[in-house]
């Protein structure tokens, strides 16, 4: 399934871009599902896929309902513990949605579309309206992060020892985690794995919406770094609300000139690898299918499905006795600056922080037998140098 995720700085028109992309895909003959958290004028707002045209369905995420359903289910599964401590139950009507629940609801919706009940509906294209730019990139990194937390907190080897739990509980003097907790963790891990596979698929791309101007230029520069760190792929940058050039009105002419200068920078920085599409200002917010068609947003291109390659690579220098003299782990980070870069080696992992973005990367087996000897950020590429540890690296006789 071809998947397009739309985002951009707040107020830049990412929801409009999602709707225009979905309509273009449907018009191109693709059976399309459009997912949004915000209402879209002229489209039905049901929480189950509802037909818009013959080839286009739309569904709106209800994060409040998802939060209430999840918490109610958790209460039922933990009823034994709650009864033990004399805790009362919370009714669905009294539950108030907590911060962060919208992100979890979106991940749940992505799972339904990728591997859940909606995945059997025969959709060719999935278009998802994501939150604003920085929040969206953090959201797409969340499945990998949450799965790591689950592995650390509830490792599989402990679940395998469930027959020893009563004995261990007596020895430790504290109750061991109940079976339902491991089962719940396994279900969530499977759900997160499906979403992570969708994000990492080479047929999944991002489309960025931004209104030309200094603020958007800085936001996109930061976003390029986040895209590279997380290994995400963008297929289009839409410059939204582009004013007509050569206006006789001095005020409009000045605004258009500022936009044109910014557009020149975007074409130089993003194209041709990522095309820049200029969507005209309609003089009003797009509200109809004709308005969306007037933006002339292209339909998604065809891409082969399968896990995309990791964004990093390893370079090596030959040494003696079959042991390399040095290995260099390389990761492109366009737009990154040294002052905002933090790198920590911890065991088999690299902890990378670049500006507002953070990622923990498990290094290749060869690098686990090495020590870090240095790092440098040059020409937009982070290079981490590893020196083989003689005590761990096998020697050739």
Residue positions per predicted region:
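P-loop NTPase motor core
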Residues: 39-41, 45-94, 101-104
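Phosphate/Mg2+-binding loops and adjacent switch elements
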Residues: 82-222
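Structural motif
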Residues: 344-346, 378-380
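Conserved nucleotide-binding/hydrolysis micro-motifs of P-loop NTPases
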Residues: 39-41, 64-66, 132-135, 155, ...
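Walker A/P-loop NTP-binding active-site region of P-loop NTPases
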Residues: 5-64, 113, 126-148
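C-terminal lobe/tail of nucleotide-utilizing enzymes
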Residues: 164, 192-338, 347-351, 355-371, ...
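Short C-terminal beta-strand
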Residues: 383-385
């Amino acid at each position: 399934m071809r998947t397009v995720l739309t985002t951009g700085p707040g107020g830049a028109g990412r929801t409009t871009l999602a709707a225009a992309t979905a309509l273009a895909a449907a018009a191109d003959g693709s059976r399309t599902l459009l997912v949004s958290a915000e209402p879209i004028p002229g489209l039905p707002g049901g929480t189950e896929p509802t037909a818009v045209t013959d080839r286009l369905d739309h569904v709106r995420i209800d994060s409040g309902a998802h939060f209430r359903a999840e918490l109610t289910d958790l209460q039922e599964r933990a009823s034994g513990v709650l009864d033990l401590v004399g805790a009362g139950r919370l009714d669905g009507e009294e539950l108030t949605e907590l911060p962060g629940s919208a992100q979890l609801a979106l991940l749940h919706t992505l799972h339904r579309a990728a591997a859940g009940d909606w995945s059997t509906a025969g959709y060719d294209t999935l278009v998802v309206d994501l939150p604003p730019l920085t929040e969206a990139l953090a959201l797409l990194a969340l499945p990998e992060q949450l799965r790591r937390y689950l592995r650390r907190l509830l490792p599989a080897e402990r679940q395998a020892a469930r027959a020893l739990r009563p004995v261990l509980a007596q020895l430790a003097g504290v109750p061991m985690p109940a079976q339902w907790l491991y089962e719940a963790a396994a279900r969530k891990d499977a759900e997160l794995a499906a979403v992570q596979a969708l994000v990492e698929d080479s047929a999944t791309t991002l489309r960025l919406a931004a209104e030309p101007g200094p603020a958007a230029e800085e936001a996109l520069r930061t976003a390029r770094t986040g895209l590279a760190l997380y290994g995400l792929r963008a297929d289009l940058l839409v410059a939204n609300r582009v004013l007509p050039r050569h206006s006789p009105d001095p005020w409009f002419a000045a605004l258009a000139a500022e936009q044109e200068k910014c557009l020149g920078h975007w074409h130089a920085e993003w194209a041709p690898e990522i095309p820049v599409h200029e969507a005209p200002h309609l003089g009003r917010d797009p509200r109809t299918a004709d308005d969306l068609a007037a933006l002339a947003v292209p339909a998604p291109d065809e891409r082969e499905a399968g896990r995309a390659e990791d964004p990093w690579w390893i370079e090596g220098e030959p040494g003696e006795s079959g042991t390399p003299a040095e290995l260099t782990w390389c990761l492109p980070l366009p737009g990154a600056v040294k002052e905002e870069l933090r790198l920590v080696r911890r065991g088999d992992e690299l902890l990378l922080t670049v500006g507002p973005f953070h990622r923990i990367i498990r290094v290749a087996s060869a690098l686990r037998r090495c020590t870090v000897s240095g790092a440098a950020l040059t020409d937009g590429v982070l290079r981490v140098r590893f020196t083989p540890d003689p005590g761990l690296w096998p020697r050739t006789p």
